[in-house]
Amino acid sequence: MASPGHILALCVCLLSMASAEAPQEPDPFTYDYHTLRIGGLTIAGILFILGILIILSKRCRCKFNQQQRTGEPDEEEGTFRSSIRRLSSRRR
């Protein structure tokens, strides 16, 4: 028959093997920075190319604050010096 020492050694071996095979819960504070970096660079690259395409397509224009051009310059247009001349000629 087996001695109590052999049985104890067998139990210790079985317990150590059982604890080694037990699935470990993933640590919630361990992050995969490589995948996060690759994903971020991919999204940044796509947004960069999309921005360049929008700029080069000339379809995205400022719709507000545009006036129809009639060919005559507006009174507000021109240099600062010409606007001073207009104001001084009105006072006389």
Swiss-Prot record:
Q: Where, if anywhere, are coiled coils annotated?
A: none
Keyword Zinc belongs to the record: no
| Post-translational modification comment from the UniProt entry | Major plasma membrane substrate for cAMP-dependent protein kinase (PKA) and protein kinase C (PKC) in several different tissues. Phosphorylated in response to insulin and adrenergic stimulation. Phosphorylation at Ser-88 stimulates sodium/potassium-transporting ATPase activity while the unphosphorylated form inhibits sodium/potassium-transporting ATPase activity. Phosphorylation increases tetramerization, decreases binding to ATP1A1 and reduces inhibition of ATP1A1 activity. Phosphorylation at Ser-83 leads to greatly reduced interaction with ATP1A1, ATP1A2 and ATP1A3.
The record places the lipid (S-palmitoyl cysteine) at 60, 62
Residues where Phosphoserine is found? 82-83, 88
Q: Which residues cross the membrane?
A: 36-56
Query: What Gene Ontology terms for biological process does this UniProt record contain?
Result: negative regulation of protein glutathionylation; positive regulation of sodium ion export across plasma membrane; potassium ion transport; regulation of cardiac muscle cell membrane potential; regulation of sodium ion transmembrane transport; sodium ion transport
Extracellular-facing ranges:
21-35
Q: Which Gene3D superfamilies does this entry report, sorted A to Z?
A: Single helix bin (1.20.5.780)
* Localization: Cell membrane, Sarcolemma; Apical cell membrane; Membrane, Caveola; Cell membrane, Sarcolemma, T-tubule
- Cellular-component GO terms for this entry: apical plasma membrane; caveola; intercalated disc; sarcolemma; sodium:potassium-exchanging ATPase complex; T-tubule
Q: Which family does it belong to?
A: Belongs to the FXYD family.
The entry's free-text remark on domains says: The cytoplasmic domain is sufficient to regulate sodium/potassium-transporting ATPase activity.
Name this protein carries in UniProt? Phospholemman
- Origin organism of this chain? Mus musculus (Mouse)
